[in-house]
């Protein structure tokens, strides 16, 4: 609840769909400390899709009397992401519990694409930026998943790394299962 209730890190975004702002989609980020959440809600029956990148303007006091200026922040600023080549953003979708990975640089430069069915919501939690390993594990996993989610990032990575080893056991497993089945 604390991730949703504060105002210090709250940013509201427009969803850009086919060159226009989709007024039916509510998109915002918020957080506390280093923790961030990203929320989407489609308030219409029709499917919505598009990109978010820049927050809507918000008022900031300048400290010069009653003077106020309008500011915006990027999604990457709202999520504490940097555009370094070896940085990746991992996050978990609340409803499905699936984990996702994206290049932080892509989010910084392009924003984030979202697709929502009518009256659907998505809440991304556990958002964090990680640095790739020397053996490029996050890069390999990001390219392999290609935008799809998985139940567990570490398990998906292990399955990817050891897929050739697993393939060598398939004939033995089939043979063992057949032997068990034949003995019944």
Regions found by a protein language model. Give the residues of each.
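Carbohydrate-interacting/catalytic domains
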Residues: 1-184
């Amino acid at each position: 609840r604390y991730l949703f209730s504060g105002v210090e890190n709250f940013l509201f975004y427009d969803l850009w769909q086919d060159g226009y702002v989709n007024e039916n989609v509510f998109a915002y980020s918020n957080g506390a400390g280093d923790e961030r959440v990203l929320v989407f809600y489609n308030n219409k029956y029709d499917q919505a899709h598009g990109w978010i990148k820049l927050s809507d303007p918000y008022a900031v006091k300048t400290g010069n009397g009653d003077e106020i200026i309008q500011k915006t922040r990027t999604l990457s600023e709202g999520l504490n992401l940097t555009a370094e080549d070896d940085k990746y953003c991992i996050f978990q979708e609340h409803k499905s519990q699936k984990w996702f990975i994206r290049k932080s640089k892509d989010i910084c430069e392009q924003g984030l694409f979202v697709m929502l069915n009518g009256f659907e919501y998505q809440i991304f939690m556990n958002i964090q930026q990680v640095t790739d390993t020397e053996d490029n594990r996050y890069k390999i996993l990001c390219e392999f998943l290609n935008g799809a989610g998985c139940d567990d990032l570490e398990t998906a990575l292990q399955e990817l790394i050891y897929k050739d080893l697993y393939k060598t056991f398939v004939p033995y497993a089939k043979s063992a299962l057949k032997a068990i089945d034949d003995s019944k």
